[in-house]
UniProtKB/Swiss-Prot annotation:
This is Peptide 2900. It is found in: Secreted. It comes from the Eukaryota. Expressed by the venom gland. The lineage of its organism: Eukaryota, Metazoa, Ecdysozoa, Arthropoda, Chelicerata. Belongs to the short scorpion toxin superfamily. Potassium channel inhibitor family.
Length: 15
C-alpha cells in the first residue's frame, strides 16, 4: 500500500 501523506512523489514512488 502506498500512502501519500506529506510526500507526494517519494512516498507514492516508494522513496
Amino acid at each position: 500500500k502506498r500512502k501519500c501523506g506529506l510526500c507526494k512523489y517519494r512516498c507514492c514512488s516508494g522513496g
